[in-house]
């Protein structure tokens, strides 16, 4: 029995030794957690289903069939409830007002303030402007009435209707958010107020520039259309942010490279101690690493110091390079498992 226990323990150590030997940097605690059995991840969903089935079948005796009448009554009640529920017809909540059609050959009348433009009938025409009058587009929600004799019809303001100006009258400027009236015959068109819309210029008139947030309509007959002011291109904020991010990343990468370079530079004290130990054996070839596991250094002579005496070697005569060996934990696991296996085999064979 004692020999059997020793063989079992030695076999466990042997199995633990194999992956550690082939994969040098295996963590022993992680391997134990993988090989161990975890009782915390038990799936309890099936247990709940079994408990529900057991509680459902607990009410009837052995060999007793479930009552079918109760189930049928419940189904009938559900069907009746479904039939009694009235079906609501799908109604369109957005009801649009009806548009009256004009008579045959009739003209299209103008709607009131904020009204909608009715559809013209067969052969109906849109009311034309007066003599030499031009008909511009109506504003948002506004209707365009006909212009007077010799007057030009401007664009209507937001939600309002645009009246026609008198012959030869001067056009005043509209207030903030107000409506812009039409200019008289050969009258000059003033600039629209803040938020106002720019009306069309009169016959022979010049088209002024639109005010703040104003829209530029088409010029009237013989009117000159000024070129809009050149827009200044705004650089995309994403591009600026991207440039800043690239600059920050470049700076961070530069600093990281400097840190890595500084970390890889061997310590001068470590180099001097290692040189003091192997001074007589330093040649133009790289020496072994100063450590068996972890981070160390190795040195060699430069070309001009090949024939120099070992006692006269200085740091200027040597090339130093950092070296990295296997982790000490992996080597310790290999050694400890090997020693434990050997001891157990000796005890099992000689007892």
Curated annotation (Swiss-Prot):
Residues 50-266 are annotated as: Disordered. It comes from the Eukaryota. Residues 101-226 are annotated as: 14 X 9 AA tandem repeats of A-A-G-A-[GR]-G-E-Q-P. Sequence repeats lie at residues 101-109, 110-118, 119-127, 128-136, 137-145, 146-154, 155-163, 164-172, 173-181, 182-190, 191-199, 200-208, 209-217, 218-226. The keyword Kinase does not apply. Belongs to the plasmodium circumsporozoite protein family. Essential sporozoite protein. In the mosquito vector, required for sporozoite development in the oocyst, migration through the vector hemolymph and entry into the vector salivary glands. In the vertebrate host, required for sporozoite migration through the host dermis and infection of host hepatocytes. Binds to highly sulfated heparan sulfate proteoglycans (HSPGs) on the surface of host hepatocytes. This is Circumsporozoite protein. The lineage of its organism: Eukaryota, Sar, Alveolata, Apicomplexa, Aconoidasida.
């Amino acid at each position: 029995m004692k020999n059997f226990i020793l063989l079992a323990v030695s076999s466990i150590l042997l199995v633990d030794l194999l992956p550690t030997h082939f994969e040098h940097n295996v963590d022993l605690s992680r391997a134990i957690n993988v090989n161990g059995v975890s009782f915390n991840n038990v799936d309890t969903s099936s247990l709940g289903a079994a408990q529900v089935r057991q509680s459902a079948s607990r009410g009837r005796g052995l060999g007793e069939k479930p009552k079918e009448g109760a189930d049928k009554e419940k189904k009938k009640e559900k069907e009746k409830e479904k039939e009694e529920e009235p079906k609501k017809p799908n109604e369109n909540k957005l009801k649009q007002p009806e548009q009256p059609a004009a008579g045959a050959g009739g003209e299209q009348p103008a709607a009131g303030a904020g009204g909608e433009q009715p559809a013209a009938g067969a052969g109906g025409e849109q009311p034309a402007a007066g003599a030499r009058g031009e008909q511009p587009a109506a504003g948002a929600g506004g209707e365009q009435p006909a212009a007077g004799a010799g007057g030009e019809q401007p664009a209507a303001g937001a939600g309002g209707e645009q009246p026609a100006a008198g012959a030869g009258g001067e056009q005043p400027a509209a207030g903030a958010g107000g409506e812009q009236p039409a200019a008289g015959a050969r009258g000059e068109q003033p600039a629209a107020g803040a938020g106002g819309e720019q009306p069309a210029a009169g016959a022979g008139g010049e088209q002024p520039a639109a005010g703040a947030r104003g829209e530029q309509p088409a010029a009237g007959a013989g009117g000159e259309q000024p070129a809009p002011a050149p827009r200044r291109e705004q650089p995309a904020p994403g591009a600026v942010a991207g440039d800043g991010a690239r600059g920050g990343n470049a700076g961070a990468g530069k600093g990281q490279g400097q840190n890595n370079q500084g970390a890889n530079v061997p310590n001068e004290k470590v180099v001097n101690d290692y040189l003091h130990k192997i001074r007589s054996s330093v040649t133009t070839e790289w020496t072994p690493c100063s450590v068996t596991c972890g981070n160390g250094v190795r040195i060699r002579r430069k070309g001009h110091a090949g024939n120099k005496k070992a006692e006269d070697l200085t740091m200027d005569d040597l090339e130093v390079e950092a070296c990295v060996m296997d982790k000490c934990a992996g080597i310790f696991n290999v050694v400890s498992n090997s020693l434990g296996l050997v001891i157990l085999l000796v005890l099992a064979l000689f007892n």
